[in-house]
């Protein structure tokens, strides 16, 4: 009994109209062998596979088992060799204990005031609820058929307006630069203070 056998179907003869058309620089092709699986011709084209479930007219089909080289150029083997690795459980146990003690020491070092803990939990839960509500609103607005397209048109219109207002001419670019610097001073404060 063989462990690794392979059953392949080989086309040994194609119709005479296919042979000798001069596709291979004038040399006639007498015999073409294609590996098939259960009378289904398969040709691999980059990312797609073409399959033909019917037999070619005038073909002769033979079935044979093979234990030699398969269609990928890899030799089939009769047995499987598995190498078992021995793990040294004694050296892994202290490492796991060290990691656990480091994690516990880190958690013991964290000290939270009760006043700050409540405010942090309140802000965190409020942020999670706000994120959930925002995603629900956005998904409901996307369900309206015309709304996303309308928002795209509004965005393109604003982009065109901003470009013509501030970026097209030099005096307008300088005006934008002064407005940005004023806003920076308001937010960050002036350097002289």
Swiss-Prot record:
Its GO CC terms are: chloroplast thylakoid membrane
Annotated membrane topology is: Multi-pass membrane protein
Note the coiled coil stretches, chain numbering.
none
Q: Which family does it belong to?
A: Belongs to the CURT family.
In which organism is this protein found? Answer: Arabidopsis thaliana
Q: Where is the transit peptide?
A: 1-51
Q: Cite a single Pfam family from the UniProt record.
A: CAAD
List, alphabetically, the PANTHER family matched. PROTEIN CURVATURE THYLAKOID 1D, CHLOROPLASTIC (PTHR33222:SF2), PTHR33222
Q: How does it assemble?
A: Homo- and heterodimers and trimers.
Q: What is this protein called?
A: Protein CURVATURE THYLAKOID 1D, chloroplastic
């Amino acid at each position: 009994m063989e462990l690794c056998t392979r059953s392949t179907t080989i086309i040994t003869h194609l119709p005479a109209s296919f042979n000798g058309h001069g596709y291979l620089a004038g040399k006639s092709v007498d015999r073409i062998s294609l590996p098939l699986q259960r009378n289904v011709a398969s040709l691999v084209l980059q990312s797609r596979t073409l399959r033909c479930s019917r037999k070619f007219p005038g073909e002769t089909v033979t079935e044979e088992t093979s234990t030699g080289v398969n269609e990928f150029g890899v030799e089939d083997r009769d047995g499987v060799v598995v190498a078992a690795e021995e793990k040294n459980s004694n050296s892994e146990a202290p490492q796991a204990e060290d990691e656990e003690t480091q994690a516990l020491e880190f958690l013991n070092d964290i000290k939270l005031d009760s006043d700050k803990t409540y405010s942090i939990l309140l802000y965190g839960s409020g942020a999670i609820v706000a994120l959930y509500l925002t995603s629900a609103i956005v998904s409901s607005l996307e369900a309206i058929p015309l709304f996303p397209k309308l928002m795209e048109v509004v965005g393109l219109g604003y982009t065109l307006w901003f470009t013509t207002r501030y970026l097209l001419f030099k005096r307008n670019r300088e005006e934008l630069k002064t407005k940005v610097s004023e806003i920076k001073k308001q937010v960050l404060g002036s350097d002289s203070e």
